[in-house]
């Protein structure tokens, strides 16, 4: 159960726990990026894409069947994300890492943490601006890919695909290992802007708590992670983190 403190006192209590910690794990979700104007996957698509469900486009099967359409959708997403800026929450998390040992684990693919100055970000779901080969001949080279929608290998015709984790795919092995290691060794697990509905990421706060960490949840709305938390702060991240992490 969360520690019994008033809503007004909760940020100060969180700050005290973080200051006393040697190792802090920060887990961020779509809510952090939403404060910068990045749509979440729960938001309805607009414009030319209004008739589609994002979960129907972000799959390997959809890409193999409609590669041009899905590639174009990701290109539009890249263009939109390129126009937004990191918000005060991103900046506060980056600043914390200049004076604390911080493992930053994110479910977001937009690269806003890196643009805010965070380094060594553990990207559980990949990166929107990266590409990788869907298949490959062993000689595929991104640098010499033939232009197209999508680009293809000049040797075998394999398609480039966005470097994100699609629905039904496993998390990157190294990123998942690093995230679990951070959960196992942190003193405080700060969970920001996630609904706690997407696994395996949603299991990390519980893993941290099982290993003795205090869990702090920051989210405007109640989430399933509130039951795991030692402290819950129902505020937007950009509002409370700058002072809480200063």
Swiss-Prot record:
InterPro entries reported in the protein's UniProt record: DHS-like_NAD/FAD-binding_dom, NAD-dep_sirtuin_deacylases, Sirtuin, Sirtuin_cat_small_dom_sf, Sirtuin_class_III, Ssirtuin_cat_dom
Deacetylase sirtuin-type domain location: 2-246
Positions contributing to NAD(+) binding: 29-49, 107-110, 193-195, 219-221, 237
Enzyme Commission code: 2.3.1.286
Q: Where do the annotations place substrate binding?
A: 74, 77
The record's subcellular location field reads: Cytoplasm
Report the function annotation for this chain: NAD-dependent lysine deacetylase and desuccinylase that specifically removes acetyl and succinyl groups on target proteins. Modulates the activities of several proteins which are inactive in their acylated form.
Q: What is known of its domains?
A: 2 residues (Tyr-74 and Arg-77) present in a large hydrophobic pocket are probably involved in substrate specificity. They are important for desuccinylation activity, but dispensable for deacetylation activity.
Q: Which family does it belong to?
A: Belongs to the sirtuin family. Class III subfamily.
What protein is this chain from? NAD-dependent protein deacylase
Which species is listed as the source? Ralstonia nicotianae (strain ATCC BAA-1114 / GMI1000) (Ralstonia solanacearum)
């Amino acid at each position: 159960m969360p520690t019994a403190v008033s809503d007004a006192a909760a940020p100060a209590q969180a700050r005290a726990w973080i200051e006393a910690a040697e190792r802090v794990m920060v887990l961020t979700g779509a809510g952090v990026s939403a404060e910068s104007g990045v749509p979440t996957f729960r938001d309805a698509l607009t414009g030319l894409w209004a008739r589609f469900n994002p979960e129907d486009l972000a799959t390997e099967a959809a890409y193999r069947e409609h590669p041009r359409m899905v590639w174009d959708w990701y290109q539009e997403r890249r263009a939109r994300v390129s126009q937004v800026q990191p918000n005060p929450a991103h900046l506060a998390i980056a600043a914390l890492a200049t004076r604390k040992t911080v493992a930053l684990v994110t479910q977001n693919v937009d690269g806003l943490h890196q643009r805010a100055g965070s380094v060594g970000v553990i990207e559980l779901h990949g990166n929107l601006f990266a590409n990788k080969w869907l298949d490959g001949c062993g000689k595929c080279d991104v640098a010499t890919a033939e232009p197209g929608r999508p680009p293809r290998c000049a040797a075998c015709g394999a398609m480039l695909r966005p470097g994100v984790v699609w629905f039904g795919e496993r998390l990157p092995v190294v990123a998942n290992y690093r995230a679990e290691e951070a959960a196992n060794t942190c003193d405080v697990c700060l969970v920001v802007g996630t609904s706690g509905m997407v696994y395996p990421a949603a299991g990390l706060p519980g893993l941290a708590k099982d290993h003795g960490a205090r869990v702090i949840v920051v989210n405007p709305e109640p989430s399933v992670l509130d039951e795991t938390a030692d402290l819950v702060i129902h505020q937007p991240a950009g509002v409370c983190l700058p002072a809480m992490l200063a």
